[in-house]
């Protein structure tokens, strides 16, 4: 199975991303509901400007994070680790992402928080259901996939 396809299928079944930013050596992580766009290979989240993590990252910053389930046995562990960039969307780009986000999470229509895009450069998918420690790696722009 193609790596990005496997990753995207699994991410479509999840809904919370943990992402971390740093500023001047200080790290901070946050959780958010996400929409994953398989075409752009990007997560879309809503978060207020006044939050600690938004203040630390500014309009654009390096980011790392995870998405994981909560299995009760090691044999069922599946999860994603990623690194990339986060940026606040503006204008039409923000409007389009918000419409898609609201379709997945209708309650978000009541929120005015800005839309942010997490654009991973690298994604590592661990899937123990395919064998203990099975990992698949996707790298943006490399044209290569590692399994």
Curated annotation (Swiss-Prot):
Transmembrane segments: none
InterPro entries reported in the protein's UniProt record: Split_barrel_FMN-bd, UPF0306
Similarity comment: Belongs to the UPF0306 family.
Protein name as annotated: UPF0306 protein YhbP
Organism of provenance: Escherichia coli O157:H7 (strain EC4115 / EHEC)
Lineage: Bacteria, Pseudomonadati, Pseudomonadota, Gammaproteobacteria, Enterobacterales
Gene: yhbP
